[in-house]
Amino acid sequence: KGKCDWDDRWYASRKLDGVRCLAVVDENRVCTLYSRMGKELTTLNRVKEAIENTGIINHVFDGEICLLDENGNEDFQGVMKELRRKDHQIENPRFMIFDMIHKSEFNAGKGNTPLTERLRTLRAWQGGRFTCAKTLQYVDQVQINDDDHFETWNKLSAEKGWEGFMLRKNVGYEGKRSKNLVKVKKFHDAEYEVIDYDTDTAEVVRNGRSETIEMLSQVWIE
C-alpha cells in the first residue's frame, strides 16, 4: 500500500498454491513445459496435448500447475509428489494461466505489448472452441482502483486463507524480477532454532544457459 500509483493500472489476482510452469509453443505447434528453474516437466502430457490441440504457435503461457482436493482447494504437496514421479502422467492437472507472451518477446526477455492486451488475447484463446476449459483455465485479473479497493483484497485474502495475491502493472513483458510485479502476503513472525539443514542441487537458467548449483532444500527447527 502506498507504493503503487493506481492510475498506472495495476491488476490483482489470487496467488495460487501450485507449481510455476512455462508452456513454450514453437512454430511447429510443439509445446514443451518447464519449471521456473528451467527443468522440463514430463508428467504433464494432458496439458501439453490440450495446448497443442488449440493450434496456437509461437507463444509462451505462464501459470501454475495445480491439483484440486475434494473441497476444490489446491493441493501443493499432492502436485509436487505427482510431478516427481517417474514414468507417470498426472491424470487431472489444471494449468492456471495468468499471462500469454509472444515467443519473440519472451526470447528477447522484454516486450512492448501491455498486460491488458496480453490478457485480452489470453481470454480469447482460452474461450476458443478447441480449448479444453477444464485443463486450461484463465486466472481472473481485477483492476485495483484505489487504496480502499486494495484493502478489500487484503481482507479477502486473509478471510479465504489464500497464499496472498499478486499485483501486476499494465506494462510490457519483463523476463526478470521487476518492481512491476508485486507479491502481497501477510507474514506471521516467530523465532525458531535451526537444528539442522540439508542442501540439494538444482538446475537454474542464468543468462540463457542452464547451470547446476547447490541450494538450501530444507531445514529442521524446534
List each model region and its residues.
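Covalent nucleotidyltransferase
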Residues: G2-A133
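Short beta-strand or tight-loop elements
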Residues: W6-D8, A190-Y192, S217
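A structural signal for short, hydrophobic beta-strand segments that form beta-sheets
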Residues: I97, E193-D196
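A short secondary-structure junction signal
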Residues: F106-N112, K176-N180, V205-G208
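Short, basic, glycine/proline-bearing loop/turn elements
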Residues: R129-Q143
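Amphipathic alpha-helical
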Residues: V139-D189, D196
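Short, conserved beta-turn/loop elements at beta-strand boundaries and strand-helix junctions
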Residues: T199-E203
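Short aromatic-glycine-enriched beta-strand elements
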Residues: V205-S210, M215-W220
